[in-house]
Amino acid sequence: VRIGTTEAGKDSWDVFVDEAGKAGITLVTTNFTDYGQPNVALTQKQIDVNLFQHLRFLGEYNVASNATLAPVGATYVVPLGLYSQKHRALADIPQGGQIAIPNDPPNQARALFVLKAAGLIALKGGRATPSAADIDKGASRVTVALVDAAQTPLSLKSIDGAVINNTYLAQSDIDPKSALYADDPTSPGAEPYINVIVARAEEKDNPTYQKLVDVFHSPAVTEAYAKESKGTQLVVTKSGPDCAAILGRIEQQIRSEK
């Protein structure tokens, strides 16, 4: 099975590949450095499945590309946090400070909600997928800099803070528990951010791909990911149809805001 990810090279990924092998599935991994690539590769049949994204990211891709990629099953959900090398608490971030956030629309929207909940920005318009253009500058304490998600850890050296996805925390040796603020992955509002294994719509019920979801939830893989996320990652066992129902609501919402 040809699988695309942004996580190859991590110990947790190696454990997943090993456990799949024990279950009779040989995984051939293609690692992508850019979040924009794995869905295109899947649509173009260069890979069979991918594992790197949450449901909102998938919804944005499907709507923008008129695609029908579908969730096979859920894997996990993680909090999204604000990190800083310059400040030790939210209160230390100065008026007019600058925070880096991911520039892709779904992660940008979630990062803005994190900053809003942390009391650093105000948003106008009430959109479900806000962008930096929806920030009420007059009512906000900080400004945001949009950067590629992979670059957010590097920006910590030069500005007040950054909202960083879990994928890049481990790669940058940042402790997930050092976040100045993070959203709550157990809240109903976190449903769009459930990560999923994804296939082309016509292959979403492929028994081998379904088995991959089971492998992901095996004790060895669960333990490897828990170790890497320092216990911040929550296992989610929703089925493909359950995930598809959430995805349908997300896509409807995105279309209504276009």
Q: What spans do the regions from the language model cover?
A:
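Short, well-ordered beta-strand elements
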Residues: 1-8, 25-31, 97-99
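Extracytoplasmic "Venus flytrap"
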Residues: 1-17, 35-37
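An extracytoplasmic/periplasmic, membrane-proximal ligand-sensing/linker region
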Residues: 8-12, 156-161, 173, 204, ...
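Short helix-initiation/N-cap motifs at beta->coil->alpha
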Residues: 29-40, 127-154
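Beta->alpha turn/N-cap motifs
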Residues: 34-35, 45-46, 50-59, 76, ...
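Ligand-binding "clamshell"
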Residues: 60-72, 87, 158, 163, ...
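A conserved helix-loop-strand patch within extracytoplasmic ligand-binding domains
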Residues: 72-122
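A bilobed periplasmic-binding-protein/Venus flytrap-type ligand-binding module shared by bacterial periplasmic
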Residues: 79-90, 193-211
